[in-house]
């Protein structure tokens, strides 16, 4: 292995020691084909460490690849090998030099005719057009395509040409497009040595990929409510008889290829984010959704949202080159939940009724104008929806226990007693895909509903939801379950997220899960990567960039008058709730600037505020008294988070308190640096609802799978039962502690920042709880009486006032 002391990572700034450790560990992880779980707290420069560590490996690997390919035949004489290697290096450099010159030329052209990013382009609204009923009709449908015709069509399709291909790529995925834009912004600050010493310069070639929702520039498609309808509308335009989509450039057409190549070179000449691509597409009248794919072969880095990377069908749709790539998943603390939610669907009785009604309206209007293929399949769809309506009507008459959340439902029972169970759902699914019927029906329903935003959304989007649910139920994952979520709601839930993720792990060279709060890591090993041995996984966790004296973590087991125990059966104690207010009031007098207080749920936050406003002292309630000390702002489930945060930030210099919710809008993606959070208070342990359908189904699955594994090892039934119950409890606790880590982790943003973290609940003193907290919190955690903690906090802020 290369001497790590000699590695130069081209970090744009002088890296902290923990950043160097991170980059070294990442380089080794990629080199050794491992799956890495990397934790680097918020504010430690995680993104730049990911970029510099992976790009350094990529550039060095490209140079080594050219030499190793040329020296494959070791039986040749030394002088022949040397000459072959030299020729390979020259060819390698020549190819990249040609690409670099082409991109430099495009970059100069862009500078002379710079797109006006500041002005931007407003997304066009749908222009009113004369309505012709025929636009709502599907093409005549037939399943039969003769084999000889299919072969002829395949032979006539020319191959897509790409003049250059990078052998290994970095695929960077994150949850939101704003997070991906931040990554692109960081990438713009970096430069890396060329992969060949015969080159003077090699710019980083990055392409940002997105869905039609982010990139479609045709208003006739982009205004559609559902993904299915957008996909169908796009295909309808491209394949239709009325001129097609004017933005789509056919890669098999000479003029189309020129436009695509120009778009490709423009995107690779400079590092652009998804908004830049959208504007570029508008400026050049070129569809960025399709044209951006031409940039994939020559790119070194590809950015994608979770929805594309984590969906097999989405990866296939854009030909995402996972094979042999370095896959980096940022903000991976929510990866298990994201994979589960992407493969989880639910429908309600009202949705089915609405979809059935809309479908029958369409059928009634166009029945006599449809060919037999459309007529028959539309009839099948109506039958299936009517059967589901009957199922829900029966379910409402069941005993409450039979429809309790998490109660399994067999697929056959959905259509029991109707002819719908005789329908070939696979053929029906094929019909939905090929006929674009969802788009046609949604378009018609929008028209008849007067095209108001609310009406079109409610009457048409539900059809897509029901169709997606039927697809999922028809093609269940091996570890999924169909269950009730009350008498009027059905849920199909993925129970084993390792199955859909396995395809990525097995094909990629290296997979890195990175986040600011990856603790506790046990769930990733048990439920995401159970098929990997310990030596195939690299765990990395670093401390914070701040010195120890800049952080104080206090377990507060009791207030001035009462113990803090926010368990389900005790959290409604009004005396304890009032003691929380008194605790905040006492600390607000010694903590400068802003205090952020996290509650387990919106419902509990509302309950606490109501209690505070009810209890009065000297004519004022405790809420008003606290508000006089520091102005209180309350996160709302419905109001704009930007407005609340802006008003809070404005008040912070004078002193302010922000009451927030774990898992709410303020707990992720918002950084409370410096005065925005000189203190973070965590009120209780935010366990999820134990009686929700998701938790019940997941708990049952864990208990069953662990029990079966234990019994297979020869363990007694009693021990297997204890182990299975323990595993389910541990999973439940991990969800809670991950949420705690994520919420409090937003307080420290840079090396000179400082803050106090208060954990208000006696249970935070338990070792089994503390071991699941982030490493940087565990190292400085203190527990004492209310008075002792108050004294330490006074000293903490007094020392920072002097500095």
UniProtKB/Swiss-Prot annotation:
A motif (DEAH box) lies at residues 330-333. ATP binds at residues 40-47. One of its GO terms (molecular function) is ATP binding. Keywords: ATP-binding, Cell cycle, DNA-binding, Helicase, Hydrolase, Iron, Iron-sulfur, Isomerase, Metal-binding, Nucleotide-binding, Nucleus. It catalyses: Couples ATP hydrolysis with the unwinding of duplex DNA at the replication fork by translocating in the 5'-3' direction. This creates two antiparallel DNA single strands (ssDNA). The leading ssDNA polymer is the template for DNA polymerase III holoenzyme which synthesizes a continuous strand; ATP + H2O = ADP + phosphate + H(+). Transmembrane segments: none annotated. Residues 5-388 form the Helicase ATP-binding domain. GO terms for biological process: establishment of sister chromatid cohesion; interstrand cross-link repair; mitotic G1 DNA damage checkpoint signaling; mitotic sister chromatid cohesion. ATP-dependent DNA helicase important for chromosome transmission and normal cell cycle progression in G(2)/M. May have a role in changing DNA topology to allow the loading of proteins involved in maintaining sister chromatid cohesion in the vicinity of the centromeres. Has a specific role in chromosome segregation during meiosis II. This is ATP-dependent DNA helicase CHL1. The lineage of its organism: Eukaryota, Fungi, Dikarya, Ascomycota, Saccharomycotina.
